[in-house]
Amino acid sequence: MEEIRELVLKYALINAYTHRGKANPKAVIGKVLGENPELRKRAKEIIPLVNEVVNEVNSLSLEEQEAKLREIYPEFFEEKNEKKEEKKGLPPLPKAERGKVVTRFAPNPDGAFHLGNARAAILSHEYARMYDGKFILRFDDTDPKVKRPEPIFYEWIKEDLEWLGFRIDEIHIASDRLEIYYDYAEKLIKMGKAYVCTCPPEKFRELRDKGIACPHREEPVEVQLERWRKMLNGEYREGEAVVRIKTDLNHPNPAVRDWPALRIIDNPNHPRTGNKYRVWPLYNFASAIDDHELGVTHIFRGQEHAENETRQRYVYEYFGWEYPVTVHHGRLSIEGVILSKSKTRKGIEEGKYLGWDDPRLGTIRALRRRGIKPEAIRELIIEVGLKRSDTTISWDNLAAINRKIIEPIANRYFFVADPIPMYVEGAQEFTAEIPLHPDYPERGVRRLKFEPDKPVYVSKDDMELFKPGNFVRLKDLFNVEIMEVNENGIRARFHSFEYEVARENRWRMVHWVTEGKACEVWVPEGDELIIREGLLESDADVKVDDIVQFERFGFVRIDDVRPEKVVAIFAHK
């Protein structure tokens, strides 16, 4: 038994180490018995041992857990380092030194985090971990007018990243750093590398497109500083003055020519700073300053934002800084799923969607609500990798990855959609004992009792099988012959118990329940949300957030458990 205890301790420590210090007894049991099938016959004595060891491990600090794991199983850390690049398939980073890589993810908290954003976030985090570096979460919230941040999204984004398995080393919020941006803006003005433009926007655009300098561009530094102070003091109104970075007026892309760095927003009503500040940096200026200030070494950026680097390099060159290594990748989308924050917001406001976690959406919260595991999302992003071309994945791709992860952990139950009563003649009382999971008998069984004077319920989806003269097998119960179908239900007659009879005759198998509990399953179908009403096994032991398999229906996540009804959300087949 001591050898088994050592084995359990090893798996408990590994599970705790990879799950922020909290080992899961079920996961440890599954690992012990799954990789040592000869122990399954001793499951009853091993389960209490696992619970005891897991409690001991969970009482240790993270540092104590790691030290103990290194003591009894140092190979884990060697294998872990070897597998990082092999398993995940990410190529080496250019100019990357172990322990010195710093990456960042800079979302705008104006909406929920979605699968499209996840590409840059996951790549940034994976490489930071691969090189034992640092991962920074930086909220880009300096546009209180067009992309207005909302307090809830700061928390949601952080929660979503942590759910995805991120270890966030630092968190910075751009709106807390306005004074820093002001200092750098003033330095650039004093250096003659930036100026305050008071041209009407249309006039500047006309000059820019012709490659002609704005009349304020070469005015003395003293004049520029005076205008700058007026911007800060509120003497200019919104749209009357802009700080611009001097660039090449003949650059082939007009948007790069003397691009705007800071502008005025009257009454910003920012959720963090209120109306304290009126001068706000635009993305490229704030990002350039922060990437330097925070020591970012590598940036992962969508191909559509490649021009940002061109703009920001002017700031870096003027200060003599080295620009971070930039890795561009294509956009990621999923067939039939909306990722656009503006379209999602509009749909929510119009009542089309239930919220940011509506299971039809592609937000991380929606995917989580639907039963997609964080490991599946990470694996998908890593599989796509650093391709520069845009990538559209099908739901089936994500489902296939998720299925591998949840199949071993999902207990099985019968759910009968659109139930129809079936009255079986000639059968005696019988209790079917069905494994919660066919591959893990140690989890126990469900018991469904058939009583001759009560009907069983079968699904309307199987109506084509219920024709007089047909034979079907009620799964894990017995075989019946269909005698009659009418408006009151189905009349059938007991034929035999043996599964072999059904198999030899190729009779179809259907699932069933007796007196089940009311259950509805929400099934996302493109832009539609179909609600399937039905019955779930009356003794089904399900809790909110459980992921289970409704046999012959699909994998679902339990969304709500009420006294009168269970609500589940369909994930995939």
From Swiss-Prot:
Name used for this protein in its record: Glutamate--tRNA ligase
Record carries keyword Nucleotide-binding: yes
Family label: Belongs to the class-I aminoacyl-tRNA synthetase family. Glutamate--tRNA ligase type 2 subfamily.
Keywords, alphabetical: Aminoacyl-tRNA synthetase, ATP-binding, Cytoplasm, Ligase, Nucleotide-binding, Protein biosynthesis
Compartments in which it is found: Cytoplasm
InterPro entries recorded: Gln/Glu-tRNA_Ligase, Glu-tRNA-synth_arc/euk, Glu/Gln-tRNA-synth, Glu/Gln-tRNA-synth_Ib_cat-dom, Glu/Gln-tRNA-synth_Ib_codon-bd, Rbsml_bL25/Gln-tRNA_synth_N, Ribosomal_bL25/Gln-tRNA_synth, Rossmann-like_a/b/a_fold
Organism: Thermococcus kodakarensis (strain ATCC BAA-918 / JCM 12380 / KOD1) (Pyrococcus kodakaraensis (strain KOD1))
Any one GO molecular-function label of the UniProt entry: glutamate-tRNA ligase activity
Motif 'HIGH' region mapped to chain: 107-117
A Pfam short name: tRNA-synt_1c
Enzyme Commission number(s): 6.1.1.17
Any GO CC annotation of this UniProt entry: cytosol
Root EC class: ligase
Keyword Cytoplasm: yes
HAMAP family linked: Glu_tRNA_synth_type2
Function (record text): Catalyzes the attachment of glutamate to tRNA(Glu) in a two-step reaction: glutamate is first activated by ATP to form Glu-AMP and then transferred to the acceptor end of tRNA(Glu).
Chief place where the protein resides: cytoplasm
PANTHER family assigned: GLUTAMATE--TRNA LIGASE (PTHR43097:SF5), GLUTAMINE-TRNA LIGASE (PTHR43097)
